[in-house]
Amino acid sequence: MAQKERSDHNDSDERRNESGGEFIDKLVHINRVAKVVKGGRRFGFAALVVVGDQKGRVGFGHGKAREVPEAIRKATESAKREMIYVPLRSGRTLHHDVEGRHGAGRVLLRSASAGTGIIAGGSMRAIFETLGMQDVVAKSLGSSNPYNMVRATFDALKRQMHPRDIAAQRGIKYSTLQARRQYIVGMEE
């Protein structure tokens, strides 16, 4: 019985905000929790929500309440406050491969060629869809706990750097970096 309840709530739920805003939110995970008191148990709900504008901004939030809709609302508000910007190559994929970690959760994100689609499981797919990413390959290498997977994915996305920033750190021109990249890509084919 408890296993069935959990699997029903694991599916991503996509919604446009009621205010007609530019954000899309997806319910990643909902968990029923219990507080043991003198008279028995008091049940509540914890929700994990991902919010994004499909243009490179994304955030996640965690909300807890006695009722499911209130927990989702709190999580959505928290996600909107904690949004990050991720630079995308051609507005569709990552600039470079990156790994993220949180606790026992470890994820590997790889850029993909056009037409590949989002190859990711569970909570990572919700993040990429709300982010506006169209082509990416992602693999969860550690914990499958949705909270750790989301935080590990955000850790990886925060490590994503635009080539202009990389060129500035190395002290070379952006055009030189791009020329090297074209040369390497040409060698692989």
Swiss-Prot record:
- The entry's keywords: Ribonucleoprotein, Ribosomal protein, RNA-binding, rRNA-binding
Which Gene Ontology molecular function entries are recorded, alphabetically?
A: rRNA binding; structural constituent of ribosome
Tell me which SUPFAM superfamilies the record gives. Answer: dsRNA-binding domain-like, Ribosomal protein S5 domain 2-like
Look up the record and give one Gene Ontology term from the biological process aspect: translation
Task: Supply the InterPro entries for this chain.
Answer: Ribosomal_Su5_D2-typ_SF, Ribosomal_uS5, Ribosomal_uS5_bac-type, Ribosomal_uS5_C, Ribosomal_uS5_N, Ribosomal_uS5_N_CS, Ribsml_uS5_D2-typ_fold_subgr
Cite the S5 DRBM domain residue spans from the record.
23-86
Q: Which Gene3D superfamilies match?
A: 3.30.160.20, 3.30.230.10
The terms describing its cellular component in GO are: small ribosomal subunit
Q: How does it assemble?
A: Part of the 30S ribosomal subunit. Contacts proteins S4 and S8.
* Sequence similarity: Belongs to the universal ribosomal protein uS5 family.
* Stated role: With S4 and S12 plays an important role in translational accuracy. Located at the back of the 30S subunit body where it stabilizes the conformation of the head with respect to the body.
UniProt domain comment: The N-terminal domain interacts with the head of the 30S subunit; the C-terminal domain interacts with the body and contacts protein S4. The interaction surface between S4 and S5 is involved in control of translational fidelity.
- Family annotation (NCBIfam families): rpsE_bact (TIGR01021)
Q: Which HAMAP family match?
A: Ribosomal_uS5_B
Name of the protein: Small ribosomal subunit protein uS5
